[in-house]
């Protein structure tokens, strides 16, 4: 059996998936790139930490995707960045999101301070019961948080 045909275990995935070969010095492990600025070699490709496309970030995304057995992964700088990125990618003007009342304050602030300007409707329920959530679902409910 050829090595690439074998099922990889978690240790192999954590160690080898997404490896960056050290072409310059021949290091046995992927180098760490401490830079925050990169030369614009091509106008179409701009590396920048906020774009999550530096070599270190790409390396980590490949590892996470392999561990989660998914096509790709995304890393973000904070939990709130993950929440807002997810919600704003799923919701459009005219959509509704239903929240449980006891949510993280940053998420509540996102809804109350930003969703109106985007035309996103939102409501809260005090209950934890599925049946109570079901009663609050509207025709335009797209997310239950």
Predicted regions and their residues:
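Short helix-loop-beta connector
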Residues: 67-71, 91-94, 139
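Conserved PLP-anchoring active-site segment centered on the Schiff-base-forming lysine
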Residues: 89-107, 125
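Active-site phosphate-binding strand-loop segment of PLP-dependent enzymes
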Residues: 128-145
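N-terminal "arm"/small-domain region of PLP-dependent enzymes with the aminotransferase-like
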Residues: 2-55, 62-63
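A glycine-rich helix N-cap at a beta->alpha junction
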Residues: 113-129
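Conserved N-terminal alpha-helix of the aminotransferase class I/II PLP-enzyme fold
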Residues: 37-84, 106-113
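Short acidic loop-to-helix transition motifs that present clustered carboxylates
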Residues: 80-83, 126-132
